[in-house]
Amino acid sequence: MVATFNPAVGSHVWVEDPDEAWLDGEVVEINGDQIKVLCASGKQVVVKDSNIYPKDVEAPASGVEDMTRLAYLHEPGVLQNLQSRYDINEIYTYTGSILIAVNPFRRLPHLYSSHMMTQYKGASLGELSPHPFAVADAAYRQMVNEGVSQSILVSGESGAGKTESTKLLMRYLAFMGGRGAATEGRTVEQKVLESNPVLEAFGNAKTVKNNNSSRFGKFVEIQFDQSGRISGAAIRTYLLERSRVCQVSDPERNYHCFYMLCAAPEEDAKKFKLGDPKIYHYLNQSKCIQLDAMNDAEEYHATKKAMDVVGISSEEQDAIFRVVASILHLGNIEFAKGTEIDSSIPRDEKSWFHLKTAAELLMCNEKSLEDSLCKRIMATRDETITKTLDPEAALLSRDALAKVMYSRLFDWLVEKINTSIGQDPDSKYLIGVLDIYGFESFKTNSFEQFCINLTNEKLQQHFNQHVFKMEQEEYKKEEINWSYIEFVDNQDILDLIEKKPGGIIALLDEACMFPRSTHETFAQKLYQTYKNHKRFTKPKLARSDFTICHYAGDVTYQTELFLDKNKDYVIAEHQALLNASTCSFVANLFPPVSDDSKQSKFSSIGTRFKQQLVSLLEILNTTEPHYIRCIKPNNLLKPGIFENQNVLQQLRCGGVMEAIRISCAGYPTRKHFDEFLNRFGIIAPQVLDKNSNEPAACKKLLDKAGLEGYQIGKSKVFLRAGQMADLDTRRTEILGRSASIIQRKVRSYLAQKTFIQLRISATQIQAVCRGYLARSIYEGMRREAAALKIQRDLRKFLARKAYTELFSATILIQAGMRGMVSRKELCLRRQTKAATIIQTRCRVYLARLHYRKLKKAAITTQCAWRGKVARKELKNLKMAARETGALQEAKNKLEKQVEELTWRLQLEKRMRTDLEEAKKQENAKYESSLEEIQNKFKETEALLIKEREAAKTVSEVLPIIKEVPVVDQELMEKLTNENEKLKGMVSSLEIKIDETAKELHETARISQDRLKQALAAESKVAKLKTAMQRLEEKISDMETEKQIMLQQTILNTPVKSVAGHPPTATIKNLENGHRTNLENQFNEVEVNGNAGKSAAERQLENVDTLIDCVKENIGFSNGKPIAAFTIYKCLLHWKCFESEKTSAFDRLIEMIGSAIENEDDNGHLAYWLTNTSALLFLLQKSLKPAGAGATASKKPPITTSLFGRMALSFRSSPNLAAAAEAAALAVIRPVEAKYPALLFKQQLAAYVEKIFGMIRDNLKKELSALISMCIQAPRISKGGIQRSARSLGKDSPAIHWQSIIDGLNSLLAILKDNYVPLVLIQKIHTQTFSFVNVQLFNSLLLRKECCTFSNGEFVKSGLAELELWCGQVNEYAGPSWDELKHIRQAVGFLVIHQKYRVSYDDIVHDLCPILSVQQLYRICTLYWDDCYNTRSVSQEVISSMRALMTEESNDADSNSFLLDDNSSIPFSIDEISNSMHEKDFASVKPAKELLENPEFVFLH
């Protein structure tokens, strides 16, 4: 594969081994062309230099994703790379554009989630980790962009995972081109996917190598329209293994459908007369009946469900299963010799039972079925001869019938699926997915293996041509000089097999057409024809076998059954029998044949299969191919086992080695400039000049090394075979010399260091000795000086002691004398101070006594004068109250309260008695009482009118109560005089009580009589007007504006309804000097009544006016949206919330929907987000479901009597002002909402969520392009040369992080300008940071080049910028920083030094507690240090993670190591409500445009 290289002692090489395929070792001795190698296993071998290959010791432990990037592209390198990746569960690897898939034999659901499909959508091939999704995406993108149909060829031996890979490809293509035309409720892609279970049930079986082996080839054409959506599909099948129906070898199984039907529910089993599968001959030939990993009963239901999806009706399903059951019963029919010679009949009762059952299931005649199995009709020119069959021939006839029935059934299923899916005749492009059997070579190879290997030979030729083409395109792309590369062409093998005439298939067809031909004559014909062919040999000691030298190896075929298996015709008796079936399904499987076909019964399976291959190749040649090679790592079908010899053989059979050989024929080693310089720059350090570019540096280095034949491309260096090894040898030599120099320097340094330490130690010992002697001399001198100092200090102490005693005695005598003198002086001062205090107290007492007398006299005088002034002022105030009706002054309030108490005592006594009498009279004499009331009412009509007008005037001018004159002026004057006198008597403010006693008594009598009459009349009126009063009370409660309430109080007077006559239009002078024209007021009532006839039209116009106003940006008032407040006030006034039917809500929702059509304008969206959330808050606080307040206590009816209302007014007058103020501030009013209002609230909440999502998605879209630039740092090669292909320009890499922050700041400014609620701003930032976390973290896991030390530092610096931003806008960021926990911990792990010292517990509990085992495992295996070349974590940690992953592999909860982007709505209505307050809207002003409209006067 590569040219022989010259190894040196110490070189790491690969040597061939018969057991392990290849072993790695180190060269220990070289003797000419004999090289001794010490293998890593400890074994020493001696090999020739031509049989060893160099090993790349710097290859990453986790392997490379694309094997074309291997330093040495040869068999051991490829095998080692696949094994390294398989050990870390990386089962996919590229070889250029070819994907190699190694079957893991375990569930890896995290690799195939819908989120993973989203990640690969639009990613270029090689950008992310190898995956079938990447191949499917590349095919889809190429089809859409270039308008060329594509094909994906999936191959591999049985059990390699072809079918599963095909399912993944179809899933991804359905994901990309979904939403196609639906048929009967199911889309095309759903039917294509659901066709797999049906085809697997009838076309798959357990083999020695695979529990779910496809026993047919399948080519799925997925058709697309111009826009890239799936418009149709078609499934083509090839070479179903019909012989398996009748012959099954142990431990294999028959087709799955037989076992599923036997495991069907009891009622179905009875319908088809089936039982235990062990009793059926076609199933019990093998001991394997049950599969551990497959539940046949569940698979039966899954298959029926899939049949429903693809459009197979229940009647057709019953017919299908009847045919399957009849085949099982046919297999149990055995034959014995009949009465005639060479005849046969069913052997026993059991056989007759199964014959009868099969006939019933096929709905044909039992006798006809027996005859078709035991007899043949020979037609001659003159007569028809019936020939009987012996038991052996009858068994063959039985098996032939079973095989042809199953084959026809399978063909019908494929045709039905195609019909159900529907093909698009106008399809522009297609993507074909070919799931074909791989190369097969067994101990016994029959006709099936011959056809399978022919298929693989054809596909291998197509594959070789494609690889050669791709190789030449690579050279053209890099603009290098190249010459034609020769590759092994297998055309001679294809000519040997399919050439006409003279090919093996042609000779086989010729043998089949002669009745007397046998497999031995056929073999002899082959021997004679191809005895000199280099690809054809005859095995020794074999009479009828032959061997063909295929591209993947020699295969020996046994010809015993070649002739029988090549014949494809239906026995005439079988055709007639089944065509005559009363079951239309069975009859349609065997339609009547034409006369021409009757004359030519023979049909060759080999020829037909060859024609199918030609048709398939024609389709593939018109498409752009993509290849997936599936590899089975072991024959035990168990995970974690990698058999080198087995895998290597499959790589050869799959053509991967041939592709590598083609690559090696040209330039097998291709290195990017920076990688090449980083690795081999040490050979010529002087070429790494910062001022030179990379291509020039690479050329200088290669010239310096003396290599020839290399090529310098646009981005890569292309090396011939063996040149990489030469460079590595030179590099190893330089590193070896450098190591010697380093060792010499280190030894010199260590010796010098030892000498210096000895010298320092000797110097230190000398210094210690000298110091000891000096300290001894110094100690003697110090002791002598200390003795002298002690003597001196003792003398000084004795002298000081004598002086201190003398001094203390003197001080003591002086202190005693001074104290005696001071005590005498203190006593004198105390006596003087006491005398002064006594004098002071005496003078104060006398002065206070005089002052109190003066103050008492002054207060008495002032009280008398103030009393006089107050009485005079009281008199003036009374006069002013009668003239102006103003009773709000404080003194008048006191007077009125006293008067009210007096009147209430009298009225309650009288009203209690009168009301009891009125109730008794009303119950007994309703009619007589009504006439008496009407007569009395005529007398008091004028008085009642005036009283009610006065009462209404009192309610209008709350809390000011105005006195209204009664119609009887004389009586009113008397009442007024008597009232004044009574007030004077109660308040003790008048002195003339005795003079007015008689007048008061007379006035009280007259008032009492009139009061009885008024109360009786009003009690009846109150009962008759109960409904009207309740309606008026409800309207009065809902009206908040003073003017509207004023008008309604005047216009809705109850006098009209009682008397039946309209009130007299009078003009009166009120006491405040104003005049009221009642006639004009009633004219206004009539106008309003006429206007009420078109209230609906007026409301529609008002709604239009409102919408025209608020659909524009009318701004904010005190930080709250004007539009939302205006809409709420209008809906509240129009009573829309209580309406059972209104169009206002629909109009508003439509207006909001049209306003947010521009999804890209964040400013406009933020404005409407604020308005909708504010309006939602107002509705949340205001609307109460209907019936919620049903249990609440009702308001007592308001008394309508004059004195009752006066008494109520007096009682409530102190609190009226506060109530009015509270009503003015109460912006939000609870309302019992009907269904339209509650629906409007739900729709509004949906729009809040929608607008929130639009703003969030706009920010994500803006940041997504920047995030992709922030995940990977710019790569710098040695010598400071930056890769031009990935250069980020002269700008700092931090500019992308700054752009993200600028985007966040820009949106934050927009949200703040539009007063978006704080909770929504925080949620937007939280979900955005979560999106950043998901994108960065997933990119880290999917891109190996991102898991580096330098990249970790780059991302960490960017995250620091985001953390600084969160600190600056902490109020608005909320918990956003916590959302970056995954990428923070992952990056923190990447930048740790000495990872190999970190234990698993430290990683899980301290460094990365939030990351799962799968995520940690992937980071650890992908990590590589591009700065300091340090190691990743230890193998013990990797093993621990792998063991945990194995335990959790079947856990559905751990199905993905990627993070999902959370696009849900992260808030509730209650959170929005809690973030606002009702008082915030108290100062909001409605829209100015509406305030000028008279219809919206209620907004004032």
Swiss-Prot record:
Tell me the leader sequence span. none
Q: Which SUPFAM superfamilies match?
A: P-loop containing nucleoside triphosphate hydrolases
One GO BP on record is: actin filament organization
Gene Ontology CC:
cytoplasm; myosin complex
Presence of the UniProt keyword Repeat in the record? yes
Q: Give residue ranges for domain Dilute.
A: 1146-1447
Task: Write down the Pfam families for this protein, in alphabetical order.
Answer: DIL, IQ, Myosin_head, Myosin_N
Binding residue positions for ATP:
156-163, 210-218
* GO MF annotation: an example: actin filament binding
Q: Assembly and interactions? A: Homodimer.
About its domains, the entry says: IQ domain mediates interaction with calmodulin. The tail domain is a globular cargo-binding domain.
Q: What's the protein here called?
A: Myosin-8
